[in-house]
Amino acid sequence: MRILGIDPGLRLTGFGLIEQTGQKLAYVASGVVKSGEGSLPARLGILFGGINEVIATYRPDTCAVEIVFVNVNPQSTLLLGQARGAAICAAVSNDLTVAEYTALQIKQAVVGHGKAAKTQVQEMVKRLLALPIAPTADAADALACAITHAHGSRLGAQSTAGYRLKGGRLV
C-alpha cells in the first residue's frame, strides 16, 4: 500500500510517500509544495494543484494528514486550517481515503513520546526509512504522518474514526 502523508502549511506544505509491504516500509518520495506570494485564494490554489500533481505522479492508495493545532494567534490557525482544507480537497477529489492524526499521535508513533523535538522526528524518519540524510522538517513531518498511518492503522482506526473522509463524506 502506498501512503501519502501531508504536513499542511500555508507557505510550505510538506508531502511524503512511503510504500508499505507487510511490516516493511520503503521511502518513495518527499518534498514541499511552496505557495509563494499572492492572494490567499491564489496560494490555496497552488497548494491544491501541487498536491494534485503529487497524487497524479505517485498514485498513493490512501492519505494521512496532520490535524491543525490551535495556535496563540487565531488568524494563523484559520489560515493553516484553510491550507489543510485545500490538501484534503485534493486527496478527496482523487478518491483517496483521508485519515487524520494529531502531532502528539505522530510523535508518539515515530519517536516514542509526544513531546519530541522536530530534529528527533527528522532523525527517526531517517532511521525508519533508511535514508542517507534526514529530510527537511516539513517533509519529515509528512513522512512521519505516513509512517504513523502505516504503523498505526489500528491506532488510526480508533483515534480518527470520526474524521475519516471518503468521497467527500465522513465515514
From Swiss-Prot:
Chain residues that bind Mg(2+) 2: E66
Binding sites annotated in the UniProt record for Mg(2+) 1: D7, D138
Protein localization: Cytoplasm
GO cellular component, one term: cytoplasm
GO biological process per UniProt: DNA recombination; DNA repair
EC main group: hydrolase
InterPro entries assigned: RNaseH-like_sf (IPR012337), RNaseH_sf (IPR036397), X-over_junc_endoDNase_Mg_BS (IPR020563), X-over_junc_endoDNase_RuvC (IPR002176)
CDD domains in alphabetical order: RuvC (cd16962)
Co-factor: note: Binds 2 Mg(2+) ion per subunit.
Swiss-Prot/TrEMBL catalytic activity: Endonucleolytic cleavage at a junction such as a reciprocal single-stranded crossover between two homologous DNA duplexes (Holliday junction)
Primary location: cytoplasm
Names of the cofactor(s): Mg(2+)
EC assignment: 3.1.21.10
A GO MF label: crossover junction DNA endonuclease activity
Active-site residue list: D7, E66, D138
Protein origin, superkingdom: Bacteria
Name of a matching Pfam family: RuvC
Record keywords, A-Z: Cytoplasm, DNA damage, DNA recombination, DNA repair, DNA-binding, Endonuclease, Hydrolase, Magnesium, Metal-binding, Nuclease
Subunit-level organization: Homodimer which binds Holliday junction (HJ) DNA. The HJ becomes 2-fold symmetrical on binding to RuvC with unstacked arms; it has a different conformation from HJ DNA in complex with RuvA. In the full resolvosome a probable DNA-RuvA(4)-RuvB(12)-RuvC(2) complex forms which resolves the HJ.
Family as reported in the entry's similarity comment: Belongs to the RuvC family.
Function text: The RuvA-RuvB-RuvC complex processes Holliday junction (HJ) DNA during genetic recombination and DNA repair. Endonuclease that resolves HJ intermediates. Cleaves cruciform DNA by making single-stranded nicks across the HJ at symmetrical positions within the homologous arms, yielding a 5'-phosphate and a 3'-hydroxyl group; requires a central core of homology in the junction. The consensus cleavage sequence is 5'-(A/T)TT(C/G)-3'. Cleavage occurs on the 3'-side of the TT dinucleotide at the point of strand exchange.
Protein name as it appears in the record: Crossover junction endodeoxyribonuclease RuvC
